[in-house]
Amino acid sequence: SRGDFSLDDSWRTFWQDRVREGHHFGSHTYDHLYFVKDGPSGEIFARPQFGPKAGVMSLYNEASYCREIRRVDERFKELTGTGIQKIWRAPGGKTSPRSIRMGSQCGYQHIGWNPAGFLGDELSSQTHPNKMLLDKASSQLQDGDITMAHLGIWSRKDPWAPAVLEQLIINLKGRGFCFATLPK
């Protein structure tokens, strides 16, 4: 709802506060680059959601894909004085062995999430009310699962965070879960 991007200068204080609190951060690619398919000669085809090539499928070699992952690290360091952890997650969870290898050769470990860990906060509030999402995650998550949620999806009429996130943590702790930061 702010109309800006999370690595804009206006977010500097927010990210500095999160660093001081001890949070860990990874790359999700600078322009939210969706993997499409492997290319013909060791490259990959991907489509950025943002930036000057938004919506245009392009061919990325290892160097250009690495640049896309690393730009987040560089920008985060400009904002906070500290880099991110050397982890990344592909937008939409779309990958191939080649795209994961490209990230790895760039020095970043890919961290996906488990299907049960997709918390559904980007789905429509009308068809996926918060109680349904909470009940599903509370019952289906298993030991070692990695979850994923956006903390501010603009299309949900019934906000997911912080109310559902807090209750989910309470529910999972009630099942004996403990929590850790990545990478581990």
Language model segments and positions:
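Acidic-and-aromatic substrate-binding clefts and catalytic sites of carbohydrate-active enzymes
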Residues: 1-10, 33-38, 87-97, 118-130, ...
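Active-site beta->alpha N-cap acidic-glycine motif
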Residues: 1-60, 64, 68-86, 160, ...
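Alpha-helical elements of Rossmann-like donor-binding domains used by nucleotide-donor carbohydrate transfer enzymes
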Residues: 13-14, 71, 98, 132, ...
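Structural recognition of the beta-strand scaffold that forms the well-ordered cores
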Residues: 24-29, 86-90, 109-114, 145-150, ...
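His/Asp/Glu-enriched short active-site or ligand-binding loop at hydrolase and phosphoryl-transfer sites
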Residues: 94-140, 176-184
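Catalytic grooves of carbohydrate-active enzymes
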Residues: 134-183
